[in-house]
């Protein structure tokens, strides 16, 4: 008799995706982050669902409804802080996942990669709208500043901003629609994730060496299920430590005050995971130029396959490219720090230099160094 997991229509799909999936035998722990993102997404949907049961999307009661969740709902404080810090874990996993894709040349699977970039945009949009919901000072002013950037679009900009706001400023209509979108987007992200996996399973996983691994595959279960479980354990411990010991560590103190349209905070900034893009936006004095640079800092990922000039796929055996990659990582950390600083000397100059270096490394230096390595290897 055939095993039910191989004959049942639904079980068969799960079996081919997570159990009998042929996987390269040499993939490292950097490949754990895909499954970690799946766990983060499930965690965010579950905690978000429970929060939505008690939250009210109204400017007069939003802030107090969040306070009510923390004070009066059973384990409401835990659900709220797991959701807030879970977003931070989500972005850490997301950035490592993208970084691994760049380092090992996973972007050569163009369909999977482009789907991933769309997913990145969707998660960023969801996180931004989620940050507005508690209706604290930084929620309100962050929403005002970021949505106002769209007014830089020629001709239709102002109308577009007012259309998004549902009025002439960020108000009740804005909060209501942001809540609606924040609720529905994670389910759209789940559907996009299925498509992302579908494309990945068409080609099979990449591996650290970057060479074809068809001759050396092992089943996903039990080898990689146990390895993924170890990753879950690590992330779970870090998340729980953060939630139970310093839940507000990554938040902004200004958000502990209710939104006040009459009082502008001295330094408006988004959540830490958007600071690198925010620093790039601020480094250009022109409003439209800044918005374009902000969008390009993420869109640039789509053209990664076109910038690949090396004869080798992975950076594993390319020390010069490795150096550039880690300079890029350091540069992104610098941009994150700059984004959290006020707009004054010397932060402005450091931000401008770092932004310029970011685009220079990706668009010019990486392709050039790859060509040099080809020459040195006489390829």
Curated annotation (Swiss-Prot):
It is a multi-pass membrane protein. Its cofactor is heme b. InterPro entries: Cyt_b/b6_C, Cyt_b/b6_C_sf, Cyt_b/b6_N, Cytb/b6-like_sf, Cytochrome_b, Cytochrome_b_C_euk/bac, Cytochrome_b_N_euk/bac, Di-haem_cyt_TM. Heme b b562 binds at residues 83, 182. A ubiquinone binds at residue 201. GO terms for biological process: mitochondrial electron transport, ubiquinol to cytochrome c. It is found in: Mitochondrion inner membrane. GO terms for molecular function: metal ion binding; ubiquinol-cytochrome-c reductase activity. Heme b b566 binds at residues 97, 196. Keywords: Electron transport, Heme, Iron, Membrane, Metal-binding, Mitochondrion, Mitochondrion inner membrane, Respiratory chain, Transmembrane, Transmembrane helix, Transport, Ubiquinone. Signal peptide: none annotated. Binds 2 heme b groups non-covalently. The chain crosses the membrane at residues 33-53, 77-98, 113-133, 178-198, 226-246, 288-308, 320-340, 347-367. It holds the Pfam family Cytochrome_B. GO terms for cellular component: mitochondrial inner membrane; respiratory chain complex III. Belongs to the cytochrome b family. The cytochrome bc1 complex contains 11 subunits: 3 respiratory subunits (MT-CYB, CYC1 and UQCRFS1), 2 core proteins (UQCRC1 and UQCRC2) and 6 low-molecular weight proteins (UQCRH/QCR6, UQCRB/QCR7, UQCRQ/QCR8, UQCR10/QCR9, UQCR11/QCR10 and a cleavage product of UQCRFS1). This cytochrome bc1 complex then forms a dimer. PANTHER family: CYTOCHROME B. Component of the ubiquinol-cytochrome c reductase complex (complex III or cytochrome b-c1 complex) that is part of the mitochondrial respiratory chain. The b-c1 complex mediates electron transfer from ubiquinol to cytochrome c. Contributes to the generation of a proton gradient across the mitochondrial membrane that is then used for ATP synthesis. Heme 1 (or BL or b562) is low-potential and absorbs at about 562 nm, and heme 2 (or BH or b566) is high-potential and absorbs at about 566 nm. This is Cytochrome b. It comes from Fukomys damarensis.
């Amino acid at each position: 008799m055939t095993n039910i997991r191989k004959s049942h229509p639904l079980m068969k799909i799960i079996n081919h995706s997570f159990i009998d999936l042929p996987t390269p035998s040499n993939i490292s722990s950097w490949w754990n982050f895909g499954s970690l993102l799946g766990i983060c997404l499930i965690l965010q949907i579950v905690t978000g669902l429970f929060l939505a049961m008690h939250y009210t999307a109204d400017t007069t009661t939003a802030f107090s409804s969040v306070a009510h969740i923390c004070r009066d709902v059973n384990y409401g404080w835990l659900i709220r802080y797991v959701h807030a810090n879970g977003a931070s874990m989500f972005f850490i996993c997301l950035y490592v996942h993208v970084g691994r894709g760049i380092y090992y040349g996973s972007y050569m699977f163009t369909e999977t990669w482009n789907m991933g970039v769309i997913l990145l945009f969707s998660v960023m949009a969801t996180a931004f709208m989620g940050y507005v919901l508690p209706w604290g000072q930084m929620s309100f002013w962050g929403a005002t500043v970021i949505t106002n950037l769209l007014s830089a679009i020629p001709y239709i900009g102002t109308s577009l901003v007012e259309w998004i706001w549902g009025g002439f400023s960020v108000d009740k209509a804005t909060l209501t629609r942001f809540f609606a979108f924040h609720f529905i987007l994670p389910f759209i992200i789940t559907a996009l994730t299925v498509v992302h996996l579908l494309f990945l399973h068409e080609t099979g996983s990449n591996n650290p060496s970057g060479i074809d691994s068809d001759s050396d595959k092992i089943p996903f279960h039990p080898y990689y299920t146990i390895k993924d479980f170890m990753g879950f354990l690590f992330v779970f411990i870090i998340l729980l430590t953060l939630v139970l010991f310093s839940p507000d560590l990554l938040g902004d103190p200004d958000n502990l005050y209710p939104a006040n349209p009459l009082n502008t905070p001295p330094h408006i900034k988004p959540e830490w995971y958007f600071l690198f893009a925010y620093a790039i936006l601020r480094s250009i004095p022109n409003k439209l130029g800044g918005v374009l640079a902000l969008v390009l800092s993420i869109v640039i990922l789509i053209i990664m396959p076109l910038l690949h000039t090396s004869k080798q796929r992975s950076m594993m055996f390319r020390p010069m490219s490795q150096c550039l990659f880690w300079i890029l990582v350091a540069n992104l950390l610098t941009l994150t720090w700059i984004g959290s600083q006020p707009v004054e000397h010397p932060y402005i100059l450091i931000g401008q230099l770092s932004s310029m270096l970011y685009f220079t490394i990706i668009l010019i230096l990486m392709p050039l160094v790859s060509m040099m390595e080809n020459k040195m290897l006489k390829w």
